[in-house]
């Protein structure tokens, strides 16, 4: 049963934004957004790629390319901002490549609240509805490409002894199904 809930990729984007506000200062981030909109949008597009196809294991390190315009907005003081932040042990910055390096655990924290809410909603659905006959679940949509979300859902399905189907291209699965149904109406 498809359902739109307010705990998808946008909430993860909000956590990402908040991380940079905490790290570099909300005023500077707002200035970057207002004065360098193209770079700001590109910065979040790149995060979208990391979010969907990013690391699948906790051993990996995450690299985030900082746009030159953001670096300039901060008056080249990113290392100092990091050293004064609560993230000083989890984040470092390479001035030559303009890359912020963070451990996987910190990256995973962007998803914590979203995962908690999705899990809670699924458990509530099982409790409120008679879903004891459900033996298979289908995970589709762009957000389901994210390894962190996949792992959380896989773990929950395993607990509930439900077989999980994850198509090769989950972001396109709904579209492909709609096109197929439109061309072969008796397929439903």
Map each language-model feature to its residues.
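A polyampholytic, Gly/Pro-enriched intrinsically disordered region
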Residues: 182-188
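Conserved A3 ("GATE") glycine/threonine-rich loop of ANL adenylate-forming enzymes
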Residues: 6-14, 168-182
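Gly/charged contiguous loops adjacent to phosphate- or pyrophosphate-bearing nucleotide/cofactor binding elements
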Residues: 4-152
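Active-site catalytic pocket residues across diverse enzymes, especially alpha/beta-hydrolases
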Residues: 20, 153, 157, 182
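A long, glycine-enriched binding/interface module in the latter
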Residues: 37, 171, 188
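Short beta-alpha connecting loops at secondary-structure transitions
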Residues: 2-5, 30, 159-166
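Conserved phosphate-binding/catalytic loops in two-lobed NTP-binding clefts
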Residues: 153-177
């Amino acid at each position: 049963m498809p359902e739109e809930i307010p705990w998808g990729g946008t909430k993860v984007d909000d956590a990402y934004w908040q991380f940079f506000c905490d790290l570099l200062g909300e005023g500077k981030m707002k200035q970057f957004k207002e004065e360098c909109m193209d770079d700001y949008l590109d910065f979040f597009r790149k995060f979208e790629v990391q979010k969907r196809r990013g690391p699948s294991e906790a051993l990996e390190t995450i690299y985030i390319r900082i746009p030159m315009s953001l670096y300039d907005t901060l008056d080249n003081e990113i290392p100092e901002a990091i050293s004064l932040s609560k993230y000083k042990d989890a984040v470092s910055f390479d001035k030559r490549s303009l890359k912020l390096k963070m451990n996987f655990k910190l990256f995973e924290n962007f998803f914590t609240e979203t995962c908690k809410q999705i899990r809670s909603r699924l458990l509530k659905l099982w409790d409120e509805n008679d879903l004891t006959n459900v033996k298979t679940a289908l995970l589709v949509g762009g957000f389901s490409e994210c390894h962190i979300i996949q792992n959380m859902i896989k773990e929950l399905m395993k607990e509930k002894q439900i077989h999980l189907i994850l198509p090769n291209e989950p972001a396109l699965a709904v579209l492909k199904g709609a096109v197929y149904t439109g061309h072969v109406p008796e397929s439903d």
